[in-house]
Regions:
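Short glycine/threonine/proline-enriched tight-turn/helix- or strand-capping micro-motif at secondary-structure
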Residues: 17-28
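Short acidic-glycine loop/turn motifs at beta-strand connectors
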Residues: 10, 82, 105-106
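Short glycine-/acidic-enriched loop or helix-start segments at secondary-structure transitions
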Residues: 50-51, 104
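Glycine-rich beta-strand-centered segment in the early N-terminal region that forms part
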Residues: 29-46, 54-98
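NAD(P)H dinucleotide-binding glycine-rich loop of Rossmann-like/cofactor-binding domains
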Residues: 72-77, 88-145
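Flexible, glycine-rich phosphate/dinucleotide-binding loops
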Residues: 15, 85, 101
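Short structural boundary motif marking the start of a folded domain
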Residues: 2-7
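Short N-terminal binding/cap micro-motifs at the start of the first secondary-structure element
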Residues: 13-19, 48-49
Length: 145
């Protein structure tokens, strides 16, 4: 049986998160259902909101439960597709969690433009963090050239 790896969230941190808050485990390779794709994750985003989720439910998301795959956005390559709009070799952005492979709903993923390099820009400057910074600089601070 082919396996993959994933990080589980195992306990809330006291102070700063540390290695003991997570556990790296081997799991069977996920199988895809109709409408899903199997993604091999290349990049993971490490975001400030993770810490808040480790403390329990806040705002728009439920808190993390011990034993769950650690949350987070990732960029990966489609290695198997059962979703018409994505093909093997496409790169996508989505809520992948901290794992090497994930079976994800194709409709929930954003297909990336491979001409934009490095692809990791989609997790920073071209992603949620960059959008948040842009609102702060241009809408709030009214930055001028």
């Amino acid at each position: 049986m082919t396996t993959t790896r994933q990080f589980l969230y195992v306990r809330p941190p006291v102070g700063m998160p540390e290695e003991s808050c997570f556990e790296l485990v081997a799991r069977p390779m996920p199988q895809t259902a109709e409408g899903q794709v199997l993604v091999r994750i290349h990049y993971l985003s490490i975001d400030p909101y993770f810490r808040r989720q480790m403390a329990g439910a806040h705002g728009y998301r439920d808190g993390l439960r011990p034993g769950a795959v650690m949350i987070g956005r990732g960029i990966g390559e489609v290695v198997e597709s059962r979703f018409a709009d994505l093909a093997r070799g496409d790169f996508v952005l989505g809520e992948t969690g901290w794992r090497a492979h994930a079976a994800l709903d194709g409709a929930a993923l954003k297909k990336l433009d491979p001409a934009i390099q490095p692809l990791s820009l989609y997790l920073g400057l071209l992603g949620q963090s960059g959008g948040t910074a842009g609102i702060g600089l241009f809408d709030v601070a009214r930055l001028q050239p």
